[in-house]
From Swiss-Prot:
Pfam families: T2SSN. PROSITE patterns: T2SP_N. It is found in: Cell inner membrane. Keywords: Cell inner membrane, Cell membrane, Membrane, Protein transport, Signal-anchor, Transmembrane, Transmembrane helix, Transport. Residues 1-6 are cytoplasmic. This is Type II secretion system protein N. GO terms for biological process: protein secretion by the type II secretion system. The gene is outN.
Length: 248
């Protein structure tokens, strides 16, 4: 019995000592250890427990001014992280959990122009405003999204096209998960355009969107003519949209 008690005490002391070392180990160790191909970290400061990086880059992702703090949230180990991006992206939130990663209380702001620059359009299209994600909770595992409580807004949304500017006011989307797939309920109302619908994306990249689109009184005449060729109008003038396919 005494031997078992001594072993438990010894293990506890080793763990405590390990945590002590981790708490005070300098963050610059991150720049000395082997990293995955293409991953770069620069100007590490603080400790492994609470520190910062001047820059983190991997593949096409680049983050500046990254700060982290290892803590506990609801009795789970948690990583509280904040970052910025040279293109104007800013985010902050918590990643926590034991066996499955849970994203908790995340806020992310991305310039709409940055998002549009990574999309494929037949003609040049620009955008104004920032797309904002407010995520209360999300759980993800190998089979896909298991739970999600989030919403996306785009305050002051405007789209620039060769046919003129399109005022979108503040589009809103509610995000949820269903059987591993991401689901979004979208609603947009402005003097130019009204859009409502529901879309989904599966872990395999299969997407589907069904909704209704109608023009507002202030929509430019050239855009109204283009809209008239989209879908079939109902008695109220709204046109039904149905898209499905697979992401590249």
């Amino acid at each position: 019995m005494k031997l078992k008690s001594g072993i438990v005490t010894g293990v506890a002391l080793v763990l405590a000592y390990g945590l002590f070392l981790a708490s005070y180990a300098p963050a610059r160790l991150l720049t000395a250890v082997p990293l995955p191909a293409g991953m770069v970290v620069a100007e590490a400061a603080g400790t492994l427990w609470q520190g910062s990086l001047q820059r983190f880059s991997w593949r096409t992702l680049t983050l500046d001014d990254v700060h982290w703090n290892i803590t506990f949230s609801d009795f789970m180990p948690a990583l509280d992280i904040a970052f910025k991006n040279p293109e104007g992206i800013a985010g902050r939130g918590i990643i926590r959990g034991w066996q499955r990663a849970q994203f908790y209380q995340w806020q992310l702001s991305v310039p709409a122009g940055y998002l549009f620059s990574h999309m494929r359009f037949i003609v040049p299209i620009g955008a104004e405003g920032n797309v904002q994600l407010n995520l209360q909770e999300a759980t993800v595992d190998r089979s896909g999204c298991q739970s999600l409580d989030a919403n996306v807004t785009w305050p002051g949304a405007r789209v620039k096209t060769p046919l003129g500017g399109l005022v979108l006011a503040t589009p809103q989307a509610t995000l949820r998960c269903q059987q591993g797939a991401l689901e979004a309920n979208l609603r947009q109302t402005s003097s130019h355009l009204q859009l409502s619908g529901k879309g989904s994306v599966t872990p395999k990249g299969e997407y589907r969107f069904t909704g209704q689109l109608s023009s507002g009184n202030d929509l430019p005449a050239t855009m109204k003519k283009l809209l008239a060729t989209t879908g079939k109008a109902n008695e109220q003038g709204a046109r039904t949209l149905n898209f499905q396919g697979r992401l590249l």
